[in-house]
A protein has these predicted regions:
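A solvent-exposed interaction/effector surface
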Residues: 2-197
Length: 197
């Protein structure tokens, strides 16, 4: 899963940061202007809410990527999926999603999918397929802000699972409530679903 990467970054930040005396002598950077500040969690945002995911028919691009280019890779995958839907005259039946099927410290395998109202009639094109989204018991979390800032959300999710002694299945799903193709990255709103055993 993505969580080992987070721990690596935390350790690097702790041990590679400025020394205590250097930190005292430095002036903190000014806060970003309000228009550039990342959206904050809002009252009522889900955090560990138990839900039941229903399987949906999706058209998806399957691939792998490294974490450094994760968002850009997913945006390109969604462009391919939406292009195929347009050619087939199909309509989306919900927000786009990424299903992470394997992760490690350097990268991940994914299915970047869009739910559809009906299955495609003809061939989709190279690298695209039709399948079902995950179903069953899951925990729902909300992330607001850039994709790069998601490590803090995943850290909170890991802590929540540990505290509740819950075991996650070997995948997780992100639903993009804001369009990842057109929304400024700092304004993303993403539902994270963690299927649990």
């Amino acid at each position: 899963m993505r969580f080992p990467r987070l721990m690596t970054w935390l350790l690097i930040a702790l041990f590679a940061g400025p020394t205590a005396t250097g930190a005292l002598a430095q002036t903190p950077p000014p806060p970003p202007p309000p228009s550039q500040a990342a959206p904050q969690p809002k009252p009522g945002d889900a955090f560990g809410e138990e839900v039941t995911l229903a399987a949906k028919t999706i058209v998806f691009a399957k691939g792998s990527a490294n974490w450094d280019s994760a968002f850009e890779t997913l945006v390109e995958a969604f462009k391919n999926v939406y292009g195929a839907l347009q050619k087939q005259g199909l309509k989306a039946a919900g927000p786009p999603m990424t299903i992470y099927t394997a992760t490690d410290d350097t990268g991940f395998e994914y299915q970047a999918g869009v739910p559809v109202t009906e299955e495609p009639k003809g061939p989709l094109g190279e690298g695209l397929a039709v399948g079902k989204s995950p179903e069953g018991r899951a925990l729902k979390f909300i992330h607001r802000g850039s994709y790069d800032a998601m490590d803090s959300t995943y850290e909170a999710i890991t802590n929540f699972l540990d505290e509740k002694r819950l075991e996650a299945r070997d995948l997780f799903v992100e639903f993009y409530l804001t369009d990842p193709l057109t929304t400024p990255e700092d304004n993303l709103v993403i539902e994270v679903y963690v299927p649990v055993k």
